[in-house]
From Swiss-Prot:
This is Large ribosomal subunit protein eL34. The lineage of its organism: Eukaryota, Fungi, Fungi incertae sedis, Microsporidia, Unikaryonidae. One of its GO terms (cellular component) is ribonucleoprotein complex. Belongs to the eukaryotic ribosomal protein eL34 family. PANTHER family: 60S RIBOSOMAL PROTEIN L34. GO terms for molecular function: structural constituent of ribosome. GO terms for biological process: translation. InterPro entries: Ribosomal_eL34, Ribosomal_eL34_C_sf, Ribosomal_eL34_CS. Residues 1-41 are annotated as: Disordered. Keywords: Ribonucleoprotein, Ribosomal protein. Pfam families: Ribosomal_L34e. It comes from Encephalitozoon cuniculi (strain GB-M1). Residues 30-41 have a biased composition (Basic residues).
Length: 110
């Protein structure tokens, strides 16, 4: 392919200013700006991929509606469902254990 002029923006070859040559339907060659790709969101606990959260750069991500940014549950934007389930169960069991200890301590003391 032949060289194509860059008409808009900076001409520097940097990571944030990448361009790709594209042939338009009319047969003209133009330079299109290529966006930087974003990484997939991951669970903060087990590092599993959070599949249902939109994958895009932070500025674009902040403009998305809430349903695209997180899942509708506690810790939906940062933690996977498995880790949330484990958190809830461990908190519940810890609470139950504390109540049992209080009851047995009161029965032994009183």
């Amino acid at each position: 392919m032949k060289n194509v002029l860059i008409h808009k923006g900076a001409t520097y070859k940097t990571r944030s200013n990448r361009r790709r040559k594209v042939r338009t339907p009319s047969g003209k060659l133009v330079n299109r700006r290529v966006k930087k790709h974003s990484k997939k969101h991951r669970c903060h606990e087990c590092n599993a991929i959070l599949g249902s959260i939109a994958r895009m750069r932070p500025a674009e991500f902040s403009r998305q509606k809430v349903s695209a940014r997180r899942v509708n549950r506690p810790y939906g934007a940062t933690t996977c469902g498995r880790c949330v389930r484990e958190k809830i169960i461990s908190a519940f069991l810890g609470n139950e254990e504390r109540i049992v200890m209080e009851k047995t301590g009161a029965a032994a003391g009183g």
